[in-house]
C-alpha cells in the first residue's frame, strides 16, 4: 500500500513538472535569461576596447580580443538555451514560429537600413568631394586597395559559401550527410574569408583615421565583417543541431533563418565590392 502511494505521488509530481515545462498556449513568452545583458556588456567591451585600440592604448587589443571571446561565448550559450526551449520543451509552436519568422525578417530589414546609412555616408563624400578632400575621390594622398586581388578573392569565397549553404538547405531533410557537408564547407569558407579580411586590414596602406575615406571604408567593411562572424556562429549552431538530430521536416526554423542571414551577408558584400572597392577605389 505504501509502495502504491509512493508510486502515485511520484507520478503526480512528475506530471506537474512536465505540465510546467511544456507550453500549452501559442504565445511566445520568454523566460528570465542572463544572456541579453551579457551580450550587451560584451558589445560594450568590444566598442570601448575598439576605440582604445584606435587611440593607441597599450591594453586596447587585449581587451578587444577578450570582448570578442565573451561575445562569442555568451551568444553560444544563448543559442543553447533557445535550442532547449524549442526542441525539448516544445515552446516553439507553429504560432510562435510565425512570430519568430516575422521578427527575424524585420530584424534583417533594420540591418538593410543600417547598411544604407553607411553607403549613404560613403556616396555623400564620393559623389561630391569637398575642397578639403582636394575635390577628388579618392582623396589626395590615399593609396587604395586593388579590387582585383584580395577583394575579388574574398568575393569568390563568399559567393561559393552562398552556394554551399544553398546546397545544405535543399539537402535538408532527406540528405542528412549533404546538410552536414554543406554547412561544414560554408563555415570553412566563412573562416577563410575572415582570415583574408584580417590580412587585408593588416596590410592596408591607410587607416581608420585617414580622413573620410578611411573611416567609411573600415566602417562599411568592418561592420560587414562583424555580420560574417555572427553568421558563422549562427551556422555553427545549426551544424551542431543537425549533428544532434534536433531538426525535423517541420521544425528547422533556426536553420532557415541562418541561411537567410547568410544570403543577406552575401548580397551586402556584392554591394561593398562594387561600390567601395571597385567604383570608389
Curated annotation (Swiss-Prot):
Which BP terms does GO give this entry? mitochondrial electron transport, cytochrome c to oxygen
Molecular functions per Gene Ontology: cytochrome-c oxidase activity
EC number, as in UniProt: 7.1.1.9
- Where is it localised? Mitochondrion inner membrane
Answer whether the UniProt record assigns the keyword Membrane to this protein: yes
The main location class comes to mitochondrion
TM helices/strands, residue ranges: 34-54, 59-79, 103-123, 148-168, 179-199, 220-240, 259-279
Per its UniProt record, what SUPFAM superfamilies does this chain match? Cytochrome c oxidase subunit III-like
Catalytic activities: 4 Fe(II)-[cytochrome c] + O2 + 8 H(+)(in) = 4 Fe(III)-[cytochrome c] + 2 H2O + 4 H(+)(out)
Q: How does it sit in the membrane?
A: Multi-pass membrane protein
- Pfam families given for it? COX3
Q: Give GO cellular component annotations, separated by semicolons.
A: mitochondrial inner membrane
Q: Which UniProt keywords apply?
A: Membrane, Mitochondrion, Mitochondrion inner membrane, Translocase, Transmembrane, Transmembrane helix
Identify the domain of life: Eukaryota
Q: What does this protein do?
A: Component of the cytochrome c oxidase, the last enzyme in the mitochondrial electron transport chain which drives oxidative phosphorylation. The respiratory chain contains 3 multisubunit complexes succinate dehydrogenase (complex II, CII), ubiquinol-cytochrome c oxidoreductase (cytochrome b-c1 complex, complex III, CIII) and cytochrome c oxidase (complex IV, CIV), that cooperate to transfer electrons derived from NADH and succinate to molecular oxygen, creating an electrochemical gradient over the inner membrane that drives transmembrane transport and the ATP synthase.
- Complex formation: Component of the cytochrome c oxidase (complex IV, CIV), a multisubunit enzyme composed of a catalytic core of 3 subunits and several supernumerary subunits. The complex exists as a monomer or a dimer and forms supercomplexes (SCs) in the inner mitochondrial membrane with ubiquinol-cytochrome c oxidoreductase (cytochrome b-c1 complex, complex III, CIII).
Family as reported in the entry's similarity comment:
Belongs to the cytochrome c oxidase subunit 3 family.
Identify this protein by name: Cytochrome c oxidase subunit 3
Q: What is the lineage of its organism?
A: Eukaryota, Fungi, Fungi incertae sedis, Mucoromycota, Mucoromycotina
